[in-house]
Amino acid sequence: MTLNLGIVGCGGMGFRHMEGISELMRYSDIARLEAICDLHESAAKHVADIAEKNNGYRPKIYTDFDSMIDESGIDVLDIVTDTKTHHSFAVKAMNKGIHVLTEKPMGVTLKACRQMKEV
């Protein structure tokens, strides 16, 4: 089974996470980078360009998070955004049955982290 992955956040860490996913894809068919999302379309396009070079196909680009989780068919979401957004992105994705991975810290408050754990 191949897991369809999505990345939200295309800054420096998002780029590095894409590189790591690309490396995984070179040696295994367990994952496929399916979608990339960033508020700044130019950042998402840049990461998608490199992903296409690395992987031989271009992931779908989104500038709207809700559209990505509704339309892309991802199984796993890699959240690589500003810490204050980890909670809201994670809860939305998990409520749709999407597994999540967040950069650390998981959330800005213990309450937010507990809410994420409960979903």
Model-derived features: where do they sit?
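Beta-loop-alpha module in the N-terminal Rossmann-like domain of NAD(P)-dependent dehydrogenases
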Residues: 54, 59-117
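N-terminal Rossmann-like dinucleotide-binding module
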Residues: 1-54
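Alpha-helical structural signal in soluble globular domains
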Residues: 20-24, 47-50, 92, 96, ...
